[in-house]
Structures are given as C-alpha cells and as structure tokens.
Amino acid sequence: MSEAVTIRTRKFMTNRLLQRKQMVVDILHPGKANLSKNEIREKLAQMYKTDSECVQAFGLRTHFGGGRSTGFALIYDSTESMKKFEPHYRLVRVGQAEPIQKVARQQRKQRKNRGKKVFGTGKRLAKRKSKQQD
C-alpha cells in the first residue's frame, strides 16, 4: 500500500535542551488514503536511523483534495527523554503510558454533596468515614 508514498521533512531543528529533533513533515500519498501515525513513525525512524519508539508524530492534516498531508514530528534521543518531556496524553496514544483512571463524575458529585450536609467536628469524622469506605 505504501509504495508510492513520499515523506519529506522541512524546518528541521535540533533541540538539545529537550533532547530531540523536531521538524515539519510533508507526506505525499497521491491516490491513496492517509498513512497511519504508526507507519509514519516507522518511516521516520528508518530515515533518521533510530528506534520507532522514540518518534512522535502529531498534528497531521490532509490538504483539500487529498494526496498531501502535513504534520509535526519529534524524534527523541531516548525513550527516557521522551517520557520526561512529552505530554502524558501523547504517551498514552502511542502506548508508552497508562491512562489516568478517574473517579466517575457522578461519584465525585455525590461525595461533594455528602460533605455539604455535615458541619463542624462532624465534618472531620465524616471525611474519615468516607475515606474508609473508598
């Protein structure tokens, strides 16, 4: 599928402070559907001779009429620096971090409203009791 796909990079910059290379990526895919982010990561890793785990592609937009997409790519020096500097949600997207498990919205509201009903020293006891239940 990806035989006639060309990937070009422009506005290349080495960012020593954040231990990465950053660039704008132009993808030419005439007559074909968009490439997946994983395919783009693998091709960029081949081009820059690095591991695909250290590559992050995002912000990909297809131009009107198709056949051409543009986005942004970051190639980190190591996976440790990627985990240190990348936003958590992007690490979750590529499977390098677990999503944050939040308490359900309704449970948060119920707990807040239970707390409103108790005043003074009883509030302290109620808080302790609710922590024991959770």
Curated annotation (Swiss-Prot):
What subcellular compartments does it reside in? Cytoplasm; Nucleus, Nucleolus
Keyword check for Acetylation:
yes
Predominant location: cytoplasm
Q: Which UniProt keywords apply?
A: Acetylation, Cytoplasm, Nucleus, Ribonucleoprotein, Ribosomal protein
For this chain, one GO molecular function annotation is: structural constituent of ribosome
- According to the UniProt record, list the residues that bear N-acetylserine: 2
Give the InterPro entries listed for this entry. eRP_eS24_sf (IPR053709), Ribosomal_eS24 (IPR001976), Ribosomal_eS24_CS (IPR018098), Ribosomal_uL23/eL15/eS24_sf (IPR012678)
At the top level, the lineage of the source is Eukaryota
Residue ranges, annotated region (Disordered): 100-134
Q: Does the keyword Lipid metabolism apply?
A: no
* Gene Ontology biological process terms, A to Z: cytoplasmic translational elongation; rRNA processing
Q: Which GO terms describe its cellular component?
A: cytosol; cytosolic small ribosomal subunit; nucleolus
> Which ranges are annotated Basic residues under compositional bias?
105-117, 124-134
Q: What else is known?
A: There are 2 genes for eS24 in S.pombe.
Quaternary structure (record)? Component of the small ribosomal subunit (SSU). Mature yeast ribosomes consist of a small (40S) and a large (60S) subunit. The 40S small subunit contains 1 molecule of ribosomal RNA (18S rRNA) and at least 33 different proteins. The large 60S subunit contains 3 rRNA molecules (25S, 5.8S and 5S rRNA) and at least 46 different proteins.
Q: What does this protein do?
A: Component of the ribosome, a large ribonucleoprotein complex responsible for the synthesis of proteins in the cell. The small ribosomal subunit (SSU) binds messenger RNAs (mRNAs) and translates the encoded message by selecting cognate aminoacyl-transfer RNA (tRNA) molecules. The large subunit (LSU) contains the ribosomal catalytic site termed the peptidyl transferase center (PTC), which catalyzes the formation of peptide bonds, thereby polymerizing the amino acids delivered by tRNAs into a polypeptide chain.
What the record says about family reads: Belongs to the eukaryotic ribosomal protein eS24 family.
User: What protein name does the entry list?
Assistant: Small ribosomal subunit protein eS24B
State the organism named in the record.
Schizosaccharomyces pombe (strain 972 / ATCC 24843) (Fission yeast)
Q: Which gene encodes it?
A: rps2402
